[in-house]
Amino acid sequence: MCSSLWHLYLIRTASGMLYTGITTDVQRRLDQHQRGGGAKSLRGKGPLTLVFQSPAGDRSRVLRWEYRVKQLSRAQKEHFVALQEQALPHFGLEHSALAAGKSAPAR
């Protein structure tokens, strides 16, 4: 079975709120949010701006990343967004070989 590459993303609403989510297709999910579908907390909060995205690898890893980011304070999330890809190790989120676009080592 082929597994999809999962991504962590953060969206900023017009009021400045940061929303954290996961998906296998960031652009499709952003479009869905923009149309009012998806998360109820984003409905009517546009325009929405994608401020962070990173491949995480498998669904299990991205769920852990999402949980960790959702536990951050607003100030910490702002710092996370400011650091972009450098934020991952800073906040204890390790990149897998798969997420970095490399093939996993053969067993």
Swiss-Prot record:
Domain of life according to the entry: Bacteria
What InterPro entries does this protein map onto?
GIY-YIG_endonuc, GIY-YIG_endonuc_sf, UPF0213_domain, UPF0213_GIY-YIG_endonuc
- Where's the GIY-YIG domain? 4-79
Give one Pfam family, short name only: GIY-YIG
The UniProt family comment states: Belongs to the UPF0213 family.
| Name of the molecule in the record | UPF0213 protein SG0387
Lineage runs: Bacteria, Pseudomonadati, Pseudomonadota, Gammaproteobacteria, Enterobacterales
